[in-house]
Amino acid sequence: FDEHLEAARPRGSLVTSEMELFFSLCPCRIFAVTGSDGKTTTTTIISELLKAQGYRVHLGGNIGKPLLCVLPQMKKEDIVVLELSSFQLHSMVCRPNVAVITNLTPNHLDKHKDFQDYIDAKRSVYERQEAEDLLVLNLNDAHSAYYASFARSRVHYFSDSAPVSDGAVCENGVIYRVSGGERREIMRADEVKIPGAHNVQNYLAAFAATDGYVDEETCRRVAMSFAG
């Protein structure tokens, strides 16, 4: 983060960003996705799922279009889906209704003091959430327990190799949503149109994030037809 901007804060200057300003003005629900890998694909999949369910969706952040200019057209019932980088999240105040952290690897360290600084920058995506909000974490990622320890919101997980009590899981080649330990089948993993095990993980994250917004049949239909 720019040292000159940081130095301005103690002198009473208001330091903000386009995205932070958008959060303060946005009238509708917000899904925010961050992580080292898969965030663009996961953000796009979440957007496609919500659109297929009938929501009016605005895609932005690192992808899509600048959203401040379309704020006047946004309605309360719309949904915004954002891809956010660690650089955007550093020192940023935000409270998305649903936050997703896909995974964490030592990326973009040129923009951070060290790996711990990078890890902690991602916490900004959910630290101001409340009990009714949702944080979605990768159960297979070593940093998820650390993130969960700071969460005040509900925490759901996704995994392609271990059982989850709430979230989404792939077991024996079948993808399920899970609520309170009860599984609801969505589809076989080999039915996902975008190839690769990493894209199954991206869909698991998206299915966990959109539970309560998008039904299982719509999830299956999108995953079988969306080409990326």
Predicted regions, residues:
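Phosphate-binding loop of NTP-binding sites
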Residues: 1-139, 143-154
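Adenine nucleotide phosphate-binding catalytic loops in nucleotide-utilizing enzymes
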Residues: 112-116, 153-228
